[in-house]
UniProtKB/Swiss-Prot annotation:
Binding site for Zn(2+) 1: D50, H52, D78
Full protein name: Phytochrome-associated serine/threonine-protein phosphatase 3
Pfam families xrefs: Metallophos
GO CC annotation: cytoplasm; nucleus; protein phosphatase type 2A complex
One biological process term in Gene Ontology: protein dephosphorylation
Binding locations of Zn(2+) 2: D78, N110, H160, H234
Cofactor annotation remark: Binds 2 zinc ions per subunit.
Length: 303
């Protein structure tokens, strides 16, 4: 496995062969299986939100924030679906994980799921680019190994979606059996699917999975777990980044500019230096993004 050569190849817009991709996926699974459900990460590190198959914009993200391994990254899931280059996005992230395992942390998002990828594009894309479903199978097997959250210097929790009524302490996240398809309910599901809302406690989510959670829930969770902040992604933010609640105890980071090639939003990444001081970097879409057409099919999001 010549990882450096493969990285150059994928950055140049080529695909790995089916056999190379299989080898890479098996290799990365061996790294991921060692990671905790709450993977400890040291600052300095840069936190990123959804990418959704926008490969050229991911390349711009690295130009904006610095390249691995000079910059350490946490990607909070939703690498695939919706954009037209999910395969390239997931492949390059796997290659960087294989080459620099200590410098990049990949969290699972609700789209890292066999079920959703068959509806929202990744399955069809793999079929189109490889002529069969093997590549999709290799990648979706890796999904089951991805960790659920990361904690920066013990004080900032990163998770794709949000909180769960079944998770009061971070230790409860450590106990989840993660090596499976995302369940339809329960704590694992909630971490992937929940959203913050301007309420006090809990409410039913319009997404049909996870919960809406409010200010008091978030403040209590942070207090009990000695956290300064919960970082999450999962929701489009027109301005790229949004703090929630009076105490700003939660932030949404969104890293797919001009989402779906038509939303007109900016993207952001959130950097923490060695003193845990924060810096937001914003970026807009690439020329390639602008040349893409709008979505081919109007599949409604609420399942």
């Amino acid at each position: 496995m010549d990882l450096d050569q493969w990285i150059s190849k994928v950055k140049d817009g080529q695909h790995l062969s089916e056999d190379e991709l299989q080898l890479l996926c098996e290799y990365v699974k061996e790294i991921l299986i060692e990671e905790s459900n709450v993977q400890p990460v040291n600052s300095p590190v840069t936190v990123c939100g959804d990418i959704h198959g926008q490969f050229h914009d991911l390349m711009k993200l690295f130009q904006t924030g610095g390249h691995v391994p000079d910059t350490n990254y946490i990607f909070m899931g939703d690498f695939v679906d919706r954009g037209y280059n999910s395969l390239e996005v997931f492949t390059i992230l796997l290659l960087l994980k294989a080459r620099y395992p200590a410098n990049i942390t990949l969290l699972r998002g609700n789209h890292e799921s066999r079920q959703l990828t068959q509806v929202y594009g990744f399955y069809d894309e793999c079929q189109r680019k490889y002529g069969n479903a093997n590549a999709w199978r290799y990648c979706t097997d890796v999904f089951d190994y991805l960790t659920l959250s990361a904690i920066i210097d013990g004080t900032v929790l990163c998770v794709h979606g949000g909180l769960s009524p079944d998770v009061r302490t971070i230790d409860q996240i450590r106990l989840i059996e993660r090596n499976c398809e995302i369940p339809h309910e329960g704590p694992f599901c909630d971490l992937m699917w929940s959203d913050p809302e301007d309420i006090e406690t809990w409410a039913v989510s319009p997404r049909g999975a996870g919960w809406l959670f409010g200010s008091r829930v978030t403040t209590e969770f942070n207090h009990i777990n000695k956290l300064d902040l919960v970082c999450r992604a999962h929701q489009l933010v027109q301005e790229g980044l949004k703090y929630m609640f009076q105490d700003k105890g939660l932030v949404t980071v969104w890293s797919a500019p001009n989402y779906c090639y038509r939303c007109g939003n900016v993207a952001s990444i959130l950097s923490f230096n060695d003193n845990m001081e924060r810096e937001v970097k914003f970026f807009t879409e690439t020329e390639e993004n602008n040349q893409m057409r709008g979505p081919r099919t109007g599949v409604p999001y609420f399942l």
